[in-house]
C-alpha cells in the first residue's frame, strides 16, 4: 500500500511539473513584471499619458495627437 501511494505521488509530481513548464513558456515581450505595473509613479496600459509621468515598463506613449496619447505596447 505504501508503494502505491508513493507511485501515485510521484506521478502527481511529474504531472504538476510538466504543467508548470508549459505555462511558463510565455513571451517576455507580452508580459509585464508586477513591480513595473504597480510602481505608482508610472502610467499603466490604456491610460492617458501626460508629460509628467512615464508609462510603465516597456509601454510607449502613442497617439494621433499630443492630447490623445495613451500608454500602449510597442
UniProtKB/Swiss-Prot annotation:
Gene Ontology cellular-component terms listed: extracellular region
Tissue: Expressed by the venom gland.
Subcellular location field: Secreted
Signal peptide: 1-19
Keyword Oxidoreductase (UniProt): no
GO molecular function, one term: ion channel regulator activity
Alphabetical UniProt keywords: Disulfide bond, Ion channel impairing toxin, Knottin, Secreted, Signal, Toxin
Propeptide segments, given as residue ranges: 20-39
Principal place of residence: secreted
Known role: Probable ion channel inhibitor.
Protein name from the UniProt record: U4-theraphotoxin-Cg1a
